[in-house]
Structure formats: structure tokens, C-alpha cells
Amino acid sequence: MVKKIIFILYILVLVCMAAATIVEKSQGTDYAHAHYYGAWWFILIWAVLAALGAFYIIKRKVKCASTLALHLSFIIILAGALLTHISAKRGMIHLRIGQPTDTYMAQDEEQGMKEEKLPFSLCLKKFEAKMHDGTNAVADYSSKFTVIDGDDKSEGEVSMNNIYSHRSYRLYQSSYDEDGKGSVLAINADPYGIPVTYTGYALLFISLVWMLFDPKGGYRKLLKSPLLKKGALITALILSMGNIQTLHAESATGNLQNAVLPKETAEKFGELHILYNDRICPVQTFALDFCKKIYGARSYQGLTAEQVLSGWVFYGNTWANEPFIKIKSGEMKTAMNLPDYASLNTFFNREMGGYTIGQYVQEYYNGQQDKFHQQAADIDGKIQIIMELREGVSLKVLPYTFTKNVKATKNHPFIKAGTTTWFSPVDKLPQAVEQQHALYIKNVFSLLNGDVKAGNISRVNEFFVKMKKYQEVSSGNSLPTATQYKAERINNAFPFATILFMANLTLGFIALFYTIYRMTKKREIKVLNIALPILLGVSFLALTFGLALRWIISGNIPMSNGYESMLTVAWFVMLISILMQLRIRIVMVFGFLISGFFLLVSHINQMDPAIGQMMPVLNSPLLSIHVSIIMMSYALLSLTFICGIMGICLRSHGEELQALSRIFLYPALTTMGFGIFIGAIWANVSWGNYWSWDSKETWALITFMIYAVVVHTQSLPVFRKPLVYHIYITLAFLSIAMTYFGVNYFLTG
């Protein structure tokens, strides 16, 4: 009876959490917290579930120490969460320079925000927003203040990911005033909940690792299973790939023969630096992104990306007639009878009122966001990129380093001495820019355009060489290092995801068919036995090199966007496969195929491969560790998914596949547990709230709890049946899909 109640409550908690994330999307965060996460009945369900779980473990006289420690850690974590809910104080304090403040706005579930008094005062001395050199991308925010506590005074400072503690109050950088003379700090006082919760986290981490090495635990027994030593795994996995549209390079059309720079000259243009995507990078990077975003490929009719970009800059009228804008299938394409690739001039017609889709774009921003208007907005976005390039707005290739402070005006903010700003030829320049520099910035492209139109290519080459020298002299400390520059040029030259997804999928199918042949014919092909593991290693090293390049370029671990995280999952899949394929040969097949499909996803245009500056709050080692470990768990769980599909298809080998799947499942749960709660520690360090019921973390917890069910084979013997196990583990993968994709695309915004 107790077991049934526990099972019902467990399902109820999962359903409530999932429902709350959906309600939050429609009703807002405050509503979801008030009526679900913070509701008395939700807390009661957790409390009863924890109490009955403890009672059931005692009743069954569980003696496995690692199991007892693991479940005890969950009870301690829940106890800490309850203490935080009951006793913690949270709020915001607004500071202005030179004005002592001893009150803050506290969060109150019933009254919303109310004013509370602090047992000390704070007086802001200075607020500073530090930028990445030469860009408008913020590197960090910091506030320096004086703490006045009775007769005692002390100095304090907070910045992103760096907190300040006084008594039981912890202060976090949250926001700031636009004039730079005020700062908003988050306040958190939780002297009881955090120590208890962190104790639970520590015990959880110890017990998760202990679970893998405990001689009396289920995982060590599983590793000794005779099923893993059988050689009768006949793989019958049918994988199919959709048609992938490829664009074949052709020679430039006659219209473009006289509207492009020679390849060598365009390459010199690509070697210049530009302020793009809030960082300084080669113009080549901007050119590649321009082609991919507008045309959907890295080149156009045999022309390099640099030739295409320079063509639009210097021969814009000719290029405006080229079918360069990719039009995706959709309602608007059908209604307006648009081709797959349209020219810029297609969308400008005086007889139809000028900009032919302008009305639809305006309607989109006025709220008509159906499929038709979404496509109009998408096309408009591409057109705006082209127009900004033609006007020169996006060509921020001309740096200037200010030698003295510049007062703020309506055209520019306050500029500190030593700051480097990158200008385009059409920007309004501050009066503090020296005249010779101002003349160069304003006129260099006009002079360059004259030589291009005159066909004086040697002069154009000379212009680009001198412009590069000007950048080196005038850019202060904003240029990337020589190593970063070379790394980016290499990264641009080799589309690692595209090359490796094709290689890995091809080798995966070869390995799959060879495995079937080897198991059915009982014959070995020595060349393949040697070549396939080596090729997996080569692919792994190539991807490692590609990720290392991105790390060097950005200075951040390559996990800052969907594209990079897909590459990282593929990397972990290959690493796991390499480590395990000597013991379990079929893992190599999984390694090729699963990494290939993750690389394929990263290749798809829905994921933007652009490298950018990381938000200050995200620039934390804890976040990097959190994401890395979560990615490893996803890689392991994707292997259990493949085992599940095979187990359903090949029921005669269900037991062997179940054993193999569970080999992946235990470390997957370990890494997921580490990842979720290291993320909680990072959140607490960054903004003072270790668990905020964000949709992403809520679905990660749901996923963890769903997968944890199948390891309870003693209390739920139904999961000892291979078919039941495989069906459950296959369906469980939907929770990962929801966590990774569903939250991003359906539950945000």
C-alpha cells in the first residue's frame, strides 16, 4: 500500500512540475510560483513523499550504504529548501552614489514588494561597467560601496559572480542606472537553508560516485553480468536520413563577371578586422555569416564569401538583381509566388508602393504573428542585413583610441580615456576624434570605391594593406591576439560540423553493416577491425581540434549556444565510445551514428554557429562545469535510447541490450545529478537563489526523476522485464528532447 502511494505521489509531482512550466508560459512567472511551486499543497506533496520514502526504506531494511546515503541526501536537500522557503529574506536595494541607504524592497508572497530595514547602511562610491576592448559588449559590472554598521565602516565590492557578505546578508550585482551613478543589488539572507542544502548537495555528490563503486551496489554487479560477455548481439537498427539539399558550386554568371573583386584582393579584404557580433574578428568571419544567413551557403556560384561581401559593398546595384536571398517554404512564398532564391529588387517595386512586404512586416510587429507574417519578418531581417551593408552601417572596420575623457552627448555616451571605439564610414564621430583620423574614417571607403570602379586593383590591394596597418596602430588593446586570429582563420576554412557529420554517419553505417555481417557470418574482416577504431579516434581528434579553436577564439569554454553544445555532446559520445569499445565492440557503432546525428543537428541552419561574447553572469567556471557534465549525461542517455529502440526491434536480444543500456544509465544519472546541483550552486553564487524553478532546471529535474525510476528494480520488479524496460527508456528520451529543445522553443519568450 505504501509503495502504491509513493508511486502515485511521485507521478503527481512530475505532472505538477510539468504543468507549472506550461502555466508559467501563459500566466507568467509570479503566477506559477504563487499557485504551484510555492503553494502549500505542492510543499505538502513533497513532504509526504519524502516521509513515506524514508519509512519504506526503513521498512524494507535496506542495507546498501550508498543507497541509504543517496536517499538521505534528497531528504536533507528538501529540508534545506523548506528552511529557505520559511526563513530566507530576499529583495533589491537601490544605491545612488554618495547617498547612504538602509532599506531594501523585500519580496512578499502576499503583498508583492514591501520595504524592509537593514541592520546596517550602504553608501555607493562607484559603479563601473567594464567593456570588452573595442566593443560595446559588457565584460563585467562592479559596484564599490561603504558598509556603515554602527561605528564601524568597511569597504565592499560586488561584481558578476562575485558576492559580498556582511552578517547573514549576501549582496549580488543585479542592475544599474542608465546614467552610471546608481546600482541595484540583490539581497539574500538565508543563514539556515543554504548550509543544510549544501550539506545535502555534498552527500548527494559523494553517494552518486559511491553508487558506481560500491561492491554491494547494483552497478558493480551489472558490470560482472555474463550477458555483457555474450557475442550474440545481432544489430538490426534501421536508420534513414532525409534528403539533404546541397548547393553545387557554379561559375559566376555573366552579370557578375565585372561585379566582383579578384579572389586574392577579396582575401585581403577578409584579412581586415571588424567589430561584429560584439567582438573583434576577421572580416572573413562576417562575410561567411553574411552568406550563410542570406543565401544559406558559405559561397555563391563559385565565389568566396569575401568576394560576395565585397561585391555587395562596391557593386551593390548589380548584386541587387542576383537571386541571393533564400526563401524558405511557407505561406508567404506560396501566396506571392516567390522562387527558392529571390533578388533584393524583387521586394522593391514602385508600382506596388515601394517595399512590397513592408505592410506585412508592420502587421507582424503589431501582433499578427501567424506563419505568413513570420516569414515576412524573416525575409525582412535578411533584407535589413543587406541594406545595412550597402549603407556602410555594418562596416565597423575603422578603430580610434581616445586619449582623453569625452563627455556624453545625444550622439554618444561618456567615453573614458584609453577606450577604443570601432567606427563605420557613416558613423557620426565625436568631436574629440583627431582631424586626420576623422578624415581617414570618413573618406577611405569613398577613395577605395573610386579605385574599384576604375579597375585599379593594385591600388585597391595597397588600400587594404594600409588599412590593416591603420587598424594595428589605432586599435589600442582591442585586437585579438595573433594566436586567436590564426585560430579563427583556420576555423573559418574548415566547417568541422559539416565534414564530421558526413564522415561519422558514413562510417557508422559501414560499422553497422559490418557488425551484422560479423555476427551472422561469424567472420572477421581484419582491415575493418583495425581501421574503424582508428577512424573514430581521428574523428574525435578533429572535433577536439575544432572545439579547441572555438575556445581559443572566444576565450570561453565552447558551450555558450545551441551549436556549440551539440558539438560538445557529440564529443562526449565519441569519448565514451572510445573508452568502452574495447570491452563492448558494438559501442563503436553507436559512437559513430549518434555523434554523427548530433553533428548533423549542429549543421542545420536552425542553430547559429556565430561566436560571440558571453554575458557577464555566464562567465563562470561553475557554469562551464555544470554544462559539461549535463552534456555528458545527455550523451550517455542517448546511448540508452538507441539500446531501447534496438531492444524493441530485436526482442531475442532484449536481455543483453538491457544490460548494456543499464551500463550507460547509472553513470548518466550520476553525471546528471552532478550537473543539476552544480548548476544550483552556480545560480546561488551568481544571483543568490539556488533553485528558482526556472523551466530549464525544472525539466532537468523531471528528466532526472523519470530516468531514476528504472533503477529501482527491487521495488518495481516490472522493469526487470527487458521489453518493459526498453519501451520505458525509449519514451523517457522525450523528456530530454523537452529539456533541451522544448523549453528553448516553446516555453521561453
Q: Which stretches of residues belong to each language-model region?
A:
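Solvent-exposed, non-transmembrane regions of integral membrane proteins
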Residues: 1-749
